Amino acid sequence: MDSLDFTRENIAKSFGSASESYDVSARLQRFSGKNLMPWLPKQNDLTVLDLGCGTGFFTHLLKGSYHQVIGLDISIKMLNYAKEKKSPDVTWLKGDAHKLPLQNESIDFVYSNLVIQWCDPLDTVIKEICRVLKPGGTFIFSTLVEGTLHELKSSWAQVDNDEHVIDFMTELELNELFNSPKCAMLEHKCQDIVLEYEDVIHLAKELKALGANHVPSQKNKGLAGKDSWLKM
């Protein structure tokens, strides 16, 4: 297993361990996912891929509007939760966004809510999305860019030299990935979203509940010690 496969396996485990608590903690996911809805195609006889479907919350909503919906996630625990709690007539697939288990030109549009920031290398994922999209197909997504969790990142920088927050792409870097004639960025919007927490402990607990506490470059893979949290 190479280092990238190991990282993806760890990400799958992180999100899998959060499957039971994900829906009650996913304030940002709900907000951003609903903000994507006005961008969706009006035509309803379409085949849709929910890439990184998680617990299937938005997969279920998509199924109410489109002919065929596929929910794909790297975490089998997330998928099992989705199968049990959400639409039974959705096609659920375990798969890696870097190697989608789908035929060429088989999908009308791909929906993805706060997923691709975990994908590395992202250009491979974009090529896969373009491969499975039909001619004229659309990729509608939300992601996080540089500046996300900057308060948490700057606070940890005063405690130790470890990486506690993932380095997100800049808006420019993201746009440059969509620069080919076959896969061009048609329209985008960058929006600041502010969530307030009682203290940093509550923020850390929510990130863990979401499975979003995996940082590939982190030296100390365990939880920060008591002294570190007191300094925070």
Regions found by a protein language model. Give the residues of each.
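Class I SAM-dependent methyltransferase SAM/SAH-binding core
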Residues: 49-99
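A short glycine-rich, Lys/Arg-flanked "PGG" loop and its adjoining helix->strand segment in the class I
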Residues: 123-135
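Conserved alpha-helix/loop element of class I SAM-dependent methyltransferases that forms part
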Residues: 27-46
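N-terminal, positively charged/glycine-rich alpha-helical extensions of SAM-dependent methyltransferases
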Residues: 1-18
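Conserved catalytic/acceptor-binding region of the Class I
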Residues: 138-202, 209-226
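A short SAM/SAH-binding and catalytic strip from SAM-dependent methyltransferases
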Residues: 109-121
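A short acidic, Gly/Pro-enriched loop at the edge of an enzyme's catalytic core
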Residues: 98-109
